[in-house]
Amino acid sequence: MILTGKEILKRLGSDIKIEPYDEKLLNPNSYNLRLHEDLLVYSEFPLDMKKPNPVRTLKIPEEGLLLEPGNLYLGRTIEFTETHNLVPMLEGRSSIGRLGMFVHITAGFGDVGFKGFWTLEIQVTHPLRVYSGVQICQIFYHTVEGEISEYKSGKYQANQGIQPSLLYKDFEKK
């Protein structure tokens, strides 16, 4: 089951934390999250799954930043979220999709217990100017059946910013 907006509001401060929170961003069954001003782009190619890949930071200026097709831009939400006893999920807003923007490639799913900023894997189908602070995606929450084991560790838990791929750490464990 997906929580309603009223239930999201009721669980704020207990099962759900959203900081900063603005009631104007609450929807009937989700909450809109906004795009931070920083983006990361990979700076050396080809990328290698077994190694850290260098990135450079782009700042979205007040007049916006033109994103180009064929590039991957890693962004993040302004909001820091923390979720307990629920599964958080992220989806792009339809207004964003109708401009040809994808906000995640495969990482729209969070684990019970995840806390952090959401890293966005942004791609565009044609040149598109983006702006910091735009309501870019929405978070919604599923209830869970069965005994819950919270996500306590991991490569991306309690992150403090945009997270490039840390897949190389999986190879180090072998």
Swiss-Prot record:
Stretches of the chain forming a coiled coil according to its record: none
SUPFAM superfamilies associated with the record: dUTPase-like
GO BP, sorted A to Z: dUMP biosynthetic process; dUTP biosynthetic process; nucleobase-containing small molecule interconversion
Presence of keyword Nucleotide-binding: yes
Disulfides per UniProt: none
GO MF term list: dCTP deaminase (dUMP-forming) activity; dCTP deaminase activity; nucleotide binding
Reaction(s) this enzyme catalyzes, per UniProt: dCTP + 2 H2O = dUMP + NH4(+) + diphosphate
Enzyme Commission no: 3.5.4.30
UniProt xrefs under CDD domains: trimeric_dUTPase
EC class (word): hydrolase
Site residues, Important for bifunctional activity: G108, F109
Annotated metabolic or biological route of this protein: Pyrimidine metabolism; dUMP biosynthesis; dUMP from dCTP: step 1/1
Family annotation (PANTHER family): DCTP DEAMINASE
Primary role: Bifunctional enzyme that catalyzes both the deamination of dCTP to dUTP and the hydrolysis of dUTP to dUMP without releasing the toxic dUTP intermediate.
Protein name from the UniProt record: dCTP deaminase, dUMP-forming
